[in-house]
Swiss-Prot record:
It comes from Homo sapiens. It is found in: Cytoplasm, Cytoskeleton, Microtubule organizing center, Centrosome, Centriole; Cytoplasm, Cytoskeleton, Flagellum axoneme; Cytoplasm, Cytoskeleton, Cilium basal body; Midbody. GO terms for cellular component: axoneme; centriole; centrosome; ciliary basal body; cytoskeleton; midbody; sperm flagellum; sperm head-tail coupling apparatus. The keyword Nuclease does not apply. Its main location: cytoplasm. Essential for sperm flagellum biogenesis and male fertility. It is linked to Spermatogenic failure 94: An autosomal recessive, male infertility disorder characterized by reduced progressive sperm motility and multiple morphologic abnormalities of the flagella, including irregularly shaped, short, absent, coiled, and multiple tails. This is Coiled-coil domain-containing protein 146. Widely expressed.
């Protein structure tokens, strides 16, 4: 049992996978459609039914012929559709075989080894490449040809429009001609209006006459149809009478044969009655014993049924418990798997945290070592610093002594100068030497001052360079720290990404497991629902069987009671058997005839039921075909609606163009166009009225012929009525010879009459008993049929509800699939976006890695990076300048204050102009005092004056 259940579950899962893969379509109702190509129309139920209706007089011959013609047309249409379906199926089979072959060849080509390169493969690659190039060239050529054709068509349209544009002289001539024609047309229109009024009055009178004649004609046609139906009915009466005569003769022969058989049976019955009397006593005893046994068996049966119902309930409870335990087991398995996976994840996280902890400990030790080394280096540098300070203090400071020494020397020099000036005896040569020495001394002093300034500047520059170097080293250290932090963050982010990817995979896996579990639960639920339905059906069937058995028991009891009565009656009949033999024979004959009539009626009703069933199947097939046609029509309507919308859009565009062109026309042309339209409309009305007049004139000769036929038919009808009246008078005439017919034989005496009345009363009592029995059987059968009808109606409602539910579920499934497809599309888009972002991240990582490697090597960054950075700076500067300029423009536009303090909204006048000379640059020059007039060229006297040469300023 478990193996079979697992197999069925696997099969159901495979079927569901196939259903999920396959697209959802509307389910066509399953109907066994027969092949109409091999059907004989004369043997169809529709033709037979029509013939029967015609024979019964319910359907006229003309209507029957019209219905037959319609049925043959429909049959031909069905045959053509079936042939087309067969052809399409053959084509589909052929095409599927071709597709399978092509797919097989493609698979062989795909499975061909890639590494195996031969000359044939190279040639094939070249051929494919050239074929692709050739196809691309063909497509380009087709597009170019299409564009060329469209441009040619546009050119032709433009040329036609240009030709249509009339010249002003021609327009005036046309206007004059059109005005003259409009005046003439107005006069004609006035005349036509008068004529139309007269014609309308005539037409109104003719229409009234025509309506009266049409009413009379309709009455005559209706009377004619009635007469035709009566004629057809009267024609079928002799045929029916002949058939009835044949049936009566056959029945007469059969009854004579049966009479002989019944006489023999009566003899045998007299012998068997004696035996039956002996058997009846034994049967009564057996009957009592059987009734007792039946009651005992019935009690046992009820007990067994109760036990069976209890066992069925226990079985259903066990199945439900099994299903719940299976679902709980599946849920526990899922929870166990998830817990194991969570355990594994926690273990991985713990190991990762331990690794990170160990790595942090190592880094901490390294940092401690580096700190120790840096402390030692700091102590050494502090010792060096103190030593250098001591050395600096030990160096003597000669700045003050040198300055004092220099001042003393200056004083001595000045004293010497004074002494030399006071000495008058010194010669000229000595004075020159003294001057030279003084000049040299001044030069040396100036050089000394310059050198001092240079020394001071150099000291400042060295200090600045040292500060810059320290700043750069600090920046370098900060950049290194940032880089290390970024690398750590990147690694942490990579780890987080991996963790999230793992979680995502686990979530997807859990979702799949939940989906599988949901599918299994849904399958089990469907199974239980089906089992419940089957159980309900079985219970209902058992109840129906129980009720049927009870009804049968009641019928058997009633039949037993009736048999007891019959036995009593038979005992009475046996006493009076000799006297009542002749009456019994007559009764038997009548009963046999009635039974035959009942059998014939039953056969006729069965035939009618079969015909109706066939007609129902045919109608259902027609409904299916009509539904298909309706669906095709709806599709065609939707397509035509889409095309109509497109055409309407194109028409709207064309209408817009036409409106633009019509606006360019003159008002006179519009009025003329309106007048022409009115004239055309009036002409159309006149033509329509003339057509109506012609139709009425054509109908008049047909009316005369119909009047003549009607008069002939009325004469015939009056003759028929006169003939019928004469026949009735002859039949009712009291003085006729055949009016009365005396019965032969002797009159009965009173005793004989009393005896005959007693016999008739006995016969009447028997007939009443039989009628009561038949009424009872009829009531029982009618009860059963009513129950069956109510059940069938209830089943119809159930089927309708089920169909509605199925349609609702199909709609839900369709909506769910559409939503799933949309979500899948969104997911694919998101996946593509994530892939692109991952690519960008990788590129950025590579870029950062290259930058870091260059920084570590001590190389400068790429020139492209520098250019991009400069571009960014330049863009920022440009953006700031543009914002400032815009703000200034807005302020100027708001203020617009003139030099004299007056505010104005007028635009400023130009203060400069660009010269037209080719040699000079196009730089703006001021107008001068007489703006906006350009300054005049210098005169002839100004040409010979030289402009002063401005000397450069020496600093």
């Amino acid at each position: 049992m478990e193996d079979s259940s697992t197999d069925t579950e696997k099969e159901e899962e495979e079927e569901k996978d196939e259903k999920d893969q396959e697209p959802i379509y509307a389910i066509v109702p399953t109907i066994n459609i027969q092949d109409e190509r091999f059907v004989d129309l004369s043997e169809t139920p529709a033709f037979i039914f029509l013939h029967e209706l015609h024979a019964m007089g319910k359907l006229p011959g003309t209507r029957m012929a019209a219905l037959k013609a319609k049925y043959t047309l429909l049959h031909d249409a069905v045959m053509s559709t079936q042939e087309s379906e067969v052809q399409l199926l053959q084509n589909a089979k052929r095409f599927t075989e071709q597709i399978q072959q092509q797919q097989f060849h493609l698979q062989q080509a795909d499975n061909f080894p890639e590494a195996f390169s031969t000359e044939v493969s190279k040639m094939r690659e070249q051929l494919l490449k050239y074929q692709n190039e050739y196809n691309a060239v063909k497509e380009r050529e087709f597009h170019n040809q299409y564009r060329l054709n469209s441009l040619k068509e546009e050119k032709i349209i433009i040329v036609k429009e240009f030709e249509k544009i009339t010249k002003p002289g021609e327009m005036e001539k046309k206007m004059k001609i059109l005005r003259e024609s409009t005046e003439e047309l107005r006069k004609e229109i006035m005349q036509k209006k008068l004529e139309i009024k007269n014609l309308r009055e005539d037409l109104a009178s003719k229409q009234k006459q025509l309506l009266k004649e049409q009413k009379e004609l309709e009455e005559l046609l209706g009377h004619q149809v009635v007469l035709k139906d009566e004629v057809a009915h009267h024609q079928t009466i002799p045929v029916q009478i002949g058939k009835e005569i044949e049936k009566i003769t056959r029945k007469k022969v059969e009854m004579e044969k049966k009479k002989i058989v019944l006489e023999q049976e009566v003899k045998t019955l007299n012998d068997s009655l004696k035996k039956v009397e002996n058997k009846v006593s034994a049967i009564v005893d057996e009957k009592e014993n059987v009734i007792k046994e039946v009651e005992g068996k019935r009690a046992l049966l009820e007990i067994k049924e109760r036990e069976h119902n209890q066992l069925v309930k226990l079985l259903e409870l066990a199945r439900e418990n099994e299903a719940t335990s299976l679902t709980e087991r599946g849920i526990l398995d899922l929870n166990l798997r998830n817990s194991l996976i969570d355990k594994q994840n926690y273990h991985d996280e713990l190991s990762r945290k331990q690794r990170e902890k160990e790595r942090d400990f190592r880094n901490l030790r390294k940092m401690e070592l580096l700190l120790k080394v840096s402390w030692d280096a700091l102590r050494q540098t502090q010792a060096l610093h103190q030593r250098l300070l001591l050395e600096m203090e030990a160096i003597p400071k000669d700045d003050s002594t040198l300055s004092e020494r220099r001042r003393e020397l200056h004083k001595e020099v000045e004293v010497a100068k004074r002494n030399l000036a006071q000495q008058k005896i010194i010669s000229e040569m000595e004075s020159k030497l003294v001057e030279q020495q003084l000049a040299e001394e001044n030069k040396l002093l100036k050089e000394q001052e310059n050198m001092k300034e240079l020394v001071v500047n150099l000291l400042r520059m060295t200090q600045i360079k040292i500060d810059e170097k320290e700043q750069k080293s600090k920046d370098f250290l900060k950049a290194q720290q940032k880089y290390t932090n970024i690398v750590k963050e990147m690694k942490a982010k990579d780890l987080e990404i991996r963790i999230h990817k793992k979680k995502k995979c686990e979530i997807y896996r859990r979702l799949r497991e939940f989906a599988k579990l949901y599918d299994t639960i849904r399958n089990e639920r469907n199974k239980f629902v089906n089992l419940l339905h089957k159980a309900h059906q079985k219970v209902n069937e058992i109840k129906e069987r129980h009720k049927m058995s009870l009804n049968e028991l009641e019928i058997l009891r009633n039949s037993a009671v009736s048999q007891e009565r019959k036995l009593q009656n038979s005992m009475l009949k046996h006493a009076n058997n000799v006297t009542i033999r002749e009456s019994m024979q007559n009764d038997v004959r009548k009963i046999v005839s009635k039974l035959q009539e009942m059998k014939e009626k039953k056969e006729a009703q069965l035939n009618n039921i079969d015909r109706l069933a066939n007609t129902i199947t045919m109608i259902e097939e027609e409904m299916v075909q009509l539904r298909k046609r309706y669906e095709k029509a709806v599709q065609h309507r939707n397509e035509s609606g889409v095309q109509l919308i497109e055409r309407e859009e194109e028409i709207c565009i064309f209408y817009e163009k036409i409106n633009i062109q019509e606006k360019m026309k003159l008002n006179g042309e519009i009025e003329i166009h309106l007048l022409e339209e009115k004239i055309q409309f009036l002409k159309m009305k006149i033509a329509e009225k003339q057509r109506q007049i012609c139709v009425t004139q054509k109908l008049l000769p047909a009316k005369r012929s119909l009047d003549a036929d009607l008069a002939v038919l009325q004469i015939q009808f009056s003759q028929c009525t006169d003939r019928i009246k004469d026949l009735e008078k002859q039949f009712v005439k009291p003085d006729g010879e055949n009016r009365a017919r005396f019965l032969p034989g002797k009159d009965l005496t009173e005793k004989e009459m009393i005896q005959k009345l007693d016999k008739l009363e006995l016969q009447l009592a028997k007939k009443e008993e039989k009628l009561l029995e038949k009424d009872f059987i009829y009531e029982q059968v009618s009860r059963l049929t009513d129950r069956l009808c109510s059940k069938t109606q209830g089943c119809k409602q159930d089927t309708l509800l089920l169909a509605k539910k199925m349609n609702g579920y199909q709609r839900r499934i369709k909506n769910a699939t559409e939503k799933m497809m949309a979500l899948v599309a969104e997911l694919s888009m998101k996946q593509a976006l994530t892939i692109e972002l991952q690519k960008e991240v990788r590129e950025k990582e590579d870029f950062i890695f290259t930058c870091n490697s260059r920084i570590e090597k001590g190389l400068p960054l790429n020139k492209e990076i520098e250019k991009e950075w400069l571009k960014v700076l330049r863009d920022e500067e440009m953006h700031a300048l543009a914002i400032a300029e815009k703000s200034q423009e807005f302020l100027e536009a708001d203020n617009r204050q003139l030099p004299n303090g007056v505010y104005t909204t007028a635009e400023q006048r130009p203060n400069a102009y660009i010269p037209e000379a080719d040699a000079t640059l196009p730089l703006p020059k001021p107008y001068g005092a007489l703006a906006p007039f350009k300054p005049s060229e210098p005169g002839a006297n100004m040409r010979h004056i030289r402009k002063p040469v401005i000397k450069p300023v020496e600093i």
